[in-house]
């Protein structure tokens, strides 16, 4: 997950510099934590606005968070447990505090961790609809969509809903077999030599 890091004052930023949106495509082929570290060694984030990148590595049972403050890249390893990360252009710290409290409270519900629970959590207006509820509603900004990816030993399923999660009626996911995920033809990519 790539999050804007708004509570850090960026060092001199070149507005023609690369977008943070280029981070994920550069890392997408990484299959392990060591692969990711190798890519970071050659990546150039110079000029990019601050960001946080969270990587979850099931085979290593590790969760890592990298933080680029627009000058240097730091990292932190987290315990292998359920966690949430939040970002807000108003205040990352306040978003973490208020949204985090809603998540910790919901964690005690009997069906915590299930897909219906996760959808309801993301549609939550705990503390009232506003800038720091999980489903954001501000005068100038709102949550625009909700996506979920479910990975099992044999399949990858992705669903997406356009609109605020609190208005979500249903998601019609697509599913592919994991073996097909590595097949370029599945994605419409030609491997024939030109």
Where are these regions (language model features)?
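N-terminal nucleophile
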Residues: 1-194
């Amino acid at each position: 997950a790539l999050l804007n890091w708004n509570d850090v004052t960026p060092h001199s930023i070149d507005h023609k510099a690369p977008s943070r949106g280029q981070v994920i495509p550069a890392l997408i082929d990484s299959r392990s934590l060591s692969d990711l570290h190798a890519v970071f060694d050659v990546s150039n984030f110079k000029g990019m606005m601050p960001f946080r990148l969270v990587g979850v590595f099931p085979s290593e049972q590790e969760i890592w968070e990298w933080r680029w403050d627009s000058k240097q890249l730091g990292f932190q390893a987290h315990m292998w447990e359920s966690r949430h990360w939040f970002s807000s252009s108003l205040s990352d710290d306040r978003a973490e505090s208020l949204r985090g409290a809603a998540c910790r409270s919901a964690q005690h519900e009997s069906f915590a961790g299930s897909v219906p629970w996760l959808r309801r959590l993301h549609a939550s207006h705990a503390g009232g609809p506003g800038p720091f509820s999980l489903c954001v509603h501000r005068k100038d900004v709102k949550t625009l969509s909700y996506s979920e990816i479910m990975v099992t030993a044999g399949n990858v399923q992705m669903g997406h809903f356009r609109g605020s999660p609190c208005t979500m009626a249903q998601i019609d996911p697509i599913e592919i077999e994991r073996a097909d995920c590595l097949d370029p033809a599945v994605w419409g990519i030609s491997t024939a030599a030109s």
